[in-house]
Amino acid sequence: MICPVIDLAQQLIKRPSLSPNDAGCQEIMIQRLEAIGFTVEPMNFGDTLNFWAWRGEGETLAFAGHTDVVPTGDESHWCSPPFEPTIRDGMLYGRGAADMKGSLAAMVVAAERFVAAHPNHKGRLAFMITSDEEAKAINGTVKVVNALMARHERLDYCLVGEPSSTDRVGDVVKNGRRGSITANLHIHGIQGHVAYPHLADNPVHRAIPALNELVTTQWDEGNEFFPATSMQIANLHAGTGSNNVIPGEFYVQFNFRFSTELTDSMIKQRVEALLERHQLDYTLEWVLSGQPFLTARGALVDAVVNAVEHYAEITPQLLTTGGTSDGRFIALMGAQVVELGPVNATIHKVNECVHAADLQLLSRMYQKIMEQLIA
């Protein structure tokens, strides 16, 4: 008999849910949850489907995730069609297998098994699911969180099913994430002929010393939980494409991944002071993607570590590396937030895959976390 986790994962992978299109994934999950006594509240915004579901009352443990996936790329490069889940040599292939339909299947089956074993569980088990995580992430978890906070909804613990593992399932648990803020900088000059530089003002030349200082600045030294803040230039643009025109504008986009040693306000102040010091004529727009968050050792981290040690027989590393996740929004509710999911080696790649056995193991870990916190 096929494993129920693998069966559900395959059902979800068959749905081509390119962000923010859910393609029917949430309906599958909702039917399974309603069948075991969950109350389900759709919370849709714009083009995005979300739902908040709960069973029981009291101290609340939520499982969070997303049904949307990234584009497949050239499908001819895949060994099998990306939305036709295939098992080869013990690996489940398909877009979303690792990020993160495998986790969603593991969560739902864990909930089914938990409710069967503990029909009168003492706490509240909840699900927070969105179809807008991989792309804009503006109508998904952030808006659900805002709506829940507005009505003072309780959330004590949240397990996000992002693919946190590196080499084997459970070897890495994310108990925090760095913040992310992007600067869109326009430096203004005067366009002119390259043969008459005295009649122009080259913004690229003016900007180079400032950019050099940005690149060489040590923004902080990090701390025991976070690496040092990093700044990376992502995009540059100047000029008309002609070799005889001095550009009149220079656009620079750069991003900070910052630790809890800094705030977004501190970064803004330091960057703007630097630009003023170099006497640049500029306009600057900031886009804050998320604040850093950290969940210290406590009930949730301990439960997750215990579950991994029990089923994987390894002690996971607690790390805050990598990109942002929806955990940054959920942390605003005051909840302890931890990420535990499959191996991330193939996420967003051609031939995305996950060990089928890992999903079964992951579901058991999720169930044990439920048992430790709300049984």
From Swiss-Prot:
Positions contributing to Zn(2+) 1 binding: 66, 99, 162
Domain of life the protein comes from: Bacteria
Pathway connected to this protein: Amino-acid biosynthesis; L-lysine biosynthesis via DAP pathway; LL-2,6-diaminopimelate from (S)-tetrahydrodipicolinate (succinylase route): step 3/3
Active-site feature positions: 68, 133 (proton acceptor)
Pfam family, one: M20_dimer
CDD domains: M20_DapE_proteobac
GO biological process: diaminopimelate biosynthetic process; L-arginine biosynthetic process; lysine biosynthetic process via diaminopimelate
Cofactor stoichiometry and binding remark: Binds 2 Zn(2+) or Co(2+) ions per subunit.
Binding annotation for Zn(2+) 2: 99, 134, 348
EC number: 3.5.1.18
Molecular-function GO term, any one: succinyl-diaminopimelate desuccinylase activity
Catalytic activity of the protein: N-succinyl-(2S,6S)-2,6-diaminopimelate + H2O = (2S,6S)-2,6-diaminopimelate + succinate
Residues in coiled coil: none
InterPro entries: ArgE/DapE_CS (IPR001261), Bact_exopeptidase_dim_dom (IPR036264), DapE_proteobac (IPR005941), Peptidase_M20 (IPR002933), Peptidase_M20_dimer (IPR011650), Peptidase_M20A (IPR050072)
Family in the record: Belongs to the peptidase M20A family. DapE subfamily.
Function, as annotated: Catalyzes the hydrolysis of N-succinyl-L,L-diaminopimelic acid (SDAP), forming succinate and LL-2,6-diaminopimelate (DAP), an intermediate involved in the bacterial biosynthesis of lysine and meso-diaminopimelic acid, an essential component of bacterial cell walls.
Self-association state and partner proteins as the record states: Homodimer.
Protein name: Succinyl-diaminopimelate desuccinylase
Organism for this UniProt entry: Yersinia enterocolitica serotype O:8 / biotype 1B (strain NCTC 13174 / 8081)
